[in-house]
Amino acid sequence: MRYMQDSSMPCQDASPPDVGAAPRRATRAVRVQWGGRTVTVGGNASVVVQSMTNTDTADAVATAIQVKELAQAGSEIVRITVNTPEAAREVATIREQLDRMGVEVPLVGDFHYNGHKLLTQFPECAQALSKYRINPGNMGGGKQRDDNFAQMIEVACRHDKPVRIGVNWGSLDHELMARKMDENSRRAQPWEAQAVIRDALVVSAISNARRAEELGLRSDAIVLSCKVSHVQDLIAVYRDLSARCDYPLHLGLTEAGMSSKGIVASTAALAVLLQEGIGDTIRISLTPEPGGDRTREVIVAQEILQTMGLRAFTPMVVACPGCGRTSSTFFQELADSIQSFLRRQMPLWRTRYPGVESMNVAVMGCVVNGPGESRHADIGISLPGTGEVPAAPVFIDGERTVTLKGDHIAEEFQAIVEDYVARRYGAGITH
């Protein structure tokens, strides 16, 4: 009979298991610039959060307003569609409006089919953008494709702009795909069609990057992406891509979907890759619900990075899910109001109280885990559950400091949080 080793017995020479993501893969550093702002993608820089507008770019006012909203939510680079002469004509106006509002977020132009024409015909558009996104799969075929691609790279070189070569499995180069399928048919053991498509995506991205370098684009001005809409395919593609080049990589699950499905799918794919040290910038492609807030994709991207311990953007609220021990939804309402309060305060706190973005706040609903979780947080409150004394102890830096009672617990706790932030993170700051 076999017996399991007693887990309470100490192991000789045992070391604790590793915690944290793998070291980031070494990549070139690509600088995306506008005005006095430089966002570095790759190298030793933190993973960058991106987003994309869904306005008609020809409507300069609406687009500038949405870009500002995305930037204020925390998007460090914003991409806009440039698909028509009318849109291209308004790009410089959008940039001017943003500059007047003090929004220096870099803009990326998203080009498909006619980018070579638009960038050439509207040089003010080419200059106002900080980066171009090129999809080599929809630039025509044969010599026409090569000429169109070369024309866009020539514009990028002339204006000293970096480029993202973004391959998408929905618009993969037909000639490359046919060649790859033909090669596969001659294998002794042919791959499944899905594997051939994944390989073609990687080959397309890398070969076009090499071609761009041959045309004069600096190697530190190239970012790559290979977008697919299935989680396992995305993971496999980026593992392969990261092993075969040192260009910085833009991660994103294309057509992720709406609401929780899109959030779960994007998180499932990106978390695996980020944990393996793969990925230099991310964008969460959520299909917005009618009347939904476009900034949601920015918040989700930030939350993925923060919950993985890769970056800190705003204080995190820990809250229990509730159970039969909780007599009301008050703790849930308090957790939501505190999280909203923290986000509202961050534009001011970010500059006034450095480090506050790493603060942890606990809002718990009963005595089972409430005091313990509150002690682990920087500041926490344990609300009474069913049958418990109607009192809410507050813990600060692991110590019980005060007990709140009555009808104004939410307001009093919010004031305590604000005072704690000022005392802990405002030390030495001159106001």
From Swiss-Prot:
Keywords for this protein: 4Fe-4S, Iron, Iron-sulfur, Isoprene biosynthesis, Metal-binding, Oxidoreductase
Binding annotation for [4Fe-4S] cluster: 320, 323, 366, 373
Top-level class of the enzyme under EC nomenclature: oxidoreductase
Name of the protein this chain belongs to: 4-hydroxy-3-methylbut-2-en-1-yl diphosphate synthase (flavodoxin)
UniProt biased composition (Polar residues): 1-10
Cofactor binding, note field: Binds 1 [4Fe-4S] cluster.
SUPFAM superfamilies: Nitrite and sulphite reductase 4Fe-4S domain-like (SSF56014)
GO molecular function: 4 iron, 4 sulfur cluster binding; 4-hydroxy-3-methylbut-2-en-1-yl diphosphate synthase activity (ferredoxin); 4-hydroxy-3-methylbut-2-enyl-diphosphate synthase activity (flavodoxin); iron ion binding
NCBIfam families: ispG_gcpE, PRK00366.1
GO biological process: isopentenyl diphosphate biosynthetic process, methylerythritol 4-phosphate pathway; terpenoid biosynthetic process
EC assignment: 1.17.7.3
Task performed by this protein: Converts 2C-methyl-D-erythritol 2,4-cyclodiphosphate (ME-2,4cPP) into 1-hydroxy-2-methyl-2-(E)-butenyl 4-diphosphate.
Region Disordered, annotated ranges: 1-24
Gene3D superfamilies: Dihydropteroate synthase-like, Sulfite Reductase Hemoprotein, domain 1
Chemical reaction(s) catalysed: (2E)-4-hydroxy-3-methylbut-2-enyl diphosphate + oxidized [flavodoxin] + H2O + 2 H(+) = 2-C-methyl-D-erythritol 2,4-cyclic diphosphate + reduced [flavodoxin]
PANTHER family the UniProt entry points to: 4-HYDROXY-3-METHYLBUT-2-EN-1-YL DIPHOSPHATE SYNTHASE, 4-HYDROXY-3-METHYLBUT-2-EN-1-YL DIPHOSPHATE SYNTHASE (FERREDOXIN), CHLOROPLASTIC
Keyword Nucleotide-binding on entry: no
Similarity field: Belongs to the IspG family.
Cofactors (names): [4Fe-4S] cluster
Keyword Iron-sulfur included in the entry's annotation: yes
Pathway: Isoprenoid biosynthesis; isopentenyl diphosphate biosynthesis via DXP pathway; isopentenyl diphosphate from 1-deoxy-D-xylulose 5-phosphate: step 5/6
